[in-house]
């Protein structure tokens, strides 16, 4: 918007007993490996880490960027302090507004990095939102939280890096530990690691407590015509 030439964006979070005990009290921790979007999912795995990116205005660029942040949105459905609405209202608004701000069509989205925590409520809610937006054809999607866990305050920064690398390297990441589709939506994520895939547009979701939902849309800048 012409306010800054560049900004460093991202997040970091570290595990501690307080956080672990808090999630345990909510009874949403999986004591084995989490299973995002699977029928048998029981909860999440916590992780820790950091992820940062540099955003630059087009006029300040001195080299070819990895990609463009073409769309973004932050919404709050205020449904519950720790839960998402069953119909996925917050996720629906967040994704819809991010896509609308980018000016691209639904059919142009090549991959979705879903929030996909592995909890029964989150995955059903996000799945409902995906169905509401895309209908029968949902683009290839997966959750990387089966690799890295839910890194909480770092998750959006880390998963933005995954999304940028998806475009830059032509990658689609597998949704680990998936066996059976959840009955709420019947959605089936990508389960194999794919390389050399022409990826032009990636939608990345990060949803938080209190219904605070964010979606980012990254787009290639040098994709062949």
Residue ranges and their predicted role:
Residues 1, 62, 66, 103-106, ...:
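Alpha-helix termination/capping residues and helix-transition junctions
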Residues 79-88, 117-134, 152-158, 191:
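Short glycine/threonine-rich loop-to-helix capping motif typified by GTGT followed
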Residues 4-12, 66-72, 107-114, 140-146, ...:
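Beta-strand segments within the central parallel beta-sheet cores of soluble alpha/beta enzyme folds
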């Amino acid at each position: 918007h012409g306010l800054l030439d560049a900004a460093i964006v991202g997040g970091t979070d570290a595990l501690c007993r307080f956080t672990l005990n808090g999630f345990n009290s909510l009874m949403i921790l999986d004591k084995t490996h989490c299973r995002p979007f699977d029928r048998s999912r029981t909860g999440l795995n916590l992780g820790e880490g950091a992820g940062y990116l540099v955003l630059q205005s087009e006029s300040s660029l001195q080299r070819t960027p990895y990609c463009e942040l073409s769309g973004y949105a932050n919404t709050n459905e205020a449904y519950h302090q720790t839960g998402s609405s069953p119909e996925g209202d917050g996720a629906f608004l967040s994704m819809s507004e991010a896509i609308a701000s980018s000016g691209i069509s639904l059919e142009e989205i090549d991959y979705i990095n879903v929030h996909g925590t592995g909890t029964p409520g989150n995955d059903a809610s996000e799945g409902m939102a995906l169905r509401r937006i895309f209908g029968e054809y949902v683009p290839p999607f997966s959750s990387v939280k089966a690799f890295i866990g839910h890194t909480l305050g770092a998750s959006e920064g880390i998963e933005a890096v995954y999304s940028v690398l998806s475009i830059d390297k032509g990658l689609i990441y597998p949704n680990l530990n998936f066996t059976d589709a959840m009955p709420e939506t019947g959605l089936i994520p990508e389960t194999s690691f794919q390389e050399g895939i022409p990826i032009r547009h990636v939608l990345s979701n990060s949803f938080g407590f209190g219904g605070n939902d964010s979606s980012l849309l990254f787009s290639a800048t040098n994709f062949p015509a």
